[in-house]
Amino acid sequence: MTLKAAILGASGYTGAELVRILATHPRIEIAALSADRKAGQGYDEVFPHLRHLKLPALVRMEEIDFSAIDLVFCALPHGLSQPLVGQLPRNVKIVDLGADFRLRDPADYKKWYGLDHAAPEVQPEAVYGLTEFYRDQIRGARLVAGTGCNAATVQFALRPLIGSGLIDLDDIICDLKNGVSGAGRSLKENMLFAERSEDVAGYSQGGKHRHLGEFDQEFSVLAGREVRIQFTPHLVPVNRGILASCYLKGEPQAVHAALAAAYADEPFIVVLPYGQLPAMAHVQGSNFCHIGVTGDRISGRALVVSTLDNLCKGSSGQAVQNANLMLGLPETEGLMLAPIFP
């Protein structure tokens, strides 16, 4: 039986990535695409590279008959999914790619996103969408909250280590290089080609990045105490990808062994042989995350590097992976995409 999906916010990059993935999914059919500001336009007008798919035209959300929908992907700006979720039929599965349900405490949402939570009564239903660590809860969930792309990249590098006793939890430094698609598709002066080309610059520095809320939430639960990491992202002039370099106090061979054991049976997480480090280009367009570990000339220091495609494994691919579990489908269905290289 084919399951019918609606994508809300389909005119953005994550919406287009969902369409690209679902176009070859054997069990999920795209039944509706919404984008209020572009309603009435053909999808091929917004994304000409998907012209061959013969997709439904974009409509306003209120034009969708959700009683005929099995699954909703919300790829909406912050604040728009919260009031919507409670209005959808209870039998509809929902995967929110935005930030509206990532943080369990509505006060944390207010702190990091500057908005009052519009659906605190719904928040307890939401399961955090880092698939590899919340698989059992996701299978039974009605609502899954996708992670931030930076949050996913760093957590894949660090989660197996946080409660292991192998690293100093008070000495974690994470330096990220981010492709510009993570900033979305809307026009921004600092994202113009002349502004970004041939430049690397930090942003949201000094403990201000919103994804820090996810690290605080997840790592502190794992450790059983407060954990605060130092985290600085940088924009680099590439379209897709995130590469996180995590500097740790710990024995590097033991760190590598712990990560290799944790991910030995994971279909989308690849831990490279000790001493090999991953490249952003080797995961672009795929749902894979590559992780490498090496030592340093300073004894007792480890470098863990993780990389993934922010639009795929960091967002839309993760969303489909979660949807597969929610719908009782094989987790890898439609997702064994080979990376695009060169």
Curated annotation (Swiss-Prot):
InterPro entries reported for this sequence: AGPR_type-1, NAD(P)-bd_dom_sf, NAGSA_dehydrogenase, Semialdehyde_DH_NAD-bd
EC number(s) per entry: 1.2.1.38
Residues annotated as catalytic: 149
Main location: cytoplasm
Molecular function, one GO term: N-acetyl-gamma-glutamyl-phosphate reductase activity
Biological process annotations from GO: L-arginine biosynthetic process
Catalytic activity: N-acetyl-L-glutamate 5-semialdehyde + phosphate + NADP(+) = N-acetyl-L-glutamyl 5-phosphate + NADPH + H(+)
Pfam families for the chain: Semialdhyde_dh, Semialdhyde_dhC_1
Pathway assigned to this chain's UniProt record: Amino-acid biosynthesis; L-arginine biosynthesis; N(2)-acetyl-L-ornithine from L-glutamate: step 3/4
Compartments where located: Cytoplasm
Enzyme class label: oxidoreductase
UniProtKB keywords: Amino-acid biosynthesis, Arginine biosynthesis, Cytoplasm, NADP, Oxidoreductase
GO cellular component: cytoplasm
HAMAP family xref list: ArgC_type1
Chain's role: Catalyzes the NADPH-dependent reduction of N-acetyl-5-glutamyl phosphate to yield N-acetyl-L-glutamate 5-semialdehyde.
Family assignment from sequence similarity: Belongs to the NAGSA dehydrogenase family. Type 1 subfamily.
Protein name from the UniProt record: N-acetyl-gamma-glutamyl-phosphate reductase
Protein's organism: Paracoccus denitrificans (strain Pd 1222)
Record gene name: argC
